[in-house]
């Protein structure tokens, strides 16, 4: 009986952790993948620096995603989307490479195209999925670079 009780004692916490995994996956966070020029990037969305407010048909969403490893060094990406759903008219994308301090890359609705595949609210979390393509400007020589990013985000909805 001691073997069975030992298995129960260790098995119950393990089972509880496994059952909690789907709930954790549904919490805030997500992933951004794509390219900046010819450089592939994969960034993790920081839940504590990302949120959305919805008032009627108007939405104001923003998230910060970061890539800490890789040849480019730390990279931050901030995407802000504002406007009436289902097609918000304003957006801004900012990309900052830690090695190029003060030389951010920025694009907005004039140089970028946003395709939203999903914008659904439920239980205090908003699922935001889509693709942004176009051009960003900045960097050391005020250059222009093509970007394509797909994002699959779960953002906390603020009141």
Where do the language-model regions lie?
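Bacterial N-terminal signal peptides that target proteins for export
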Residues: 2-12
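N-terminal signal peptide c-region/cleavage motif recognized by signal peptidases
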Residues: 20-22
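An ectodomain-focused feature that recognizes extracytoplasmic/extracellular
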Residues: 25-109
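Acidic, glycine-rich flexible loop segments
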Residues: 90-156
């Amino acid at each position: 009986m001691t073997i069975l009780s030992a298995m129960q004692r260790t098995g119950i916490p393990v089972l509880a952790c496994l059952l909690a995994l789907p709930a954790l996956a549904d919490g805030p966070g997500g992933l951004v993948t794509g390219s900046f020029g010819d450089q592939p990037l994969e960034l993790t969305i920081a839940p504590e620096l990302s949120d959305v407010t919805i008032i009627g048909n108007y939405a104001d969403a923003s998230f910060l995603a970061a890539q800490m490893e890789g040849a480019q060094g730390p990279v931050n990406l901030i995407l802000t989307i504002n406007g009436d759903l289902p097609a918000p008219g304003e957006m801004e994308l900012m990309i900052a490479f830690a090695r190029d301090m003060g030389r951010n890359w920025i694009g907005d609705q004039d140089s970028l195209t946003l395709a939203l595949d999903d914008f659904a609210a439920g239980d205090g979390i908003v699922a935001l999925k889509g693709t942004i393509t176009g051009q960003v400007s900045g960097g050391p020589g005020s250059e222009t670079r093509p970007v394509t990013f797909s994002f699959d985000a779960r953002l906390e909805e603020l009141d």
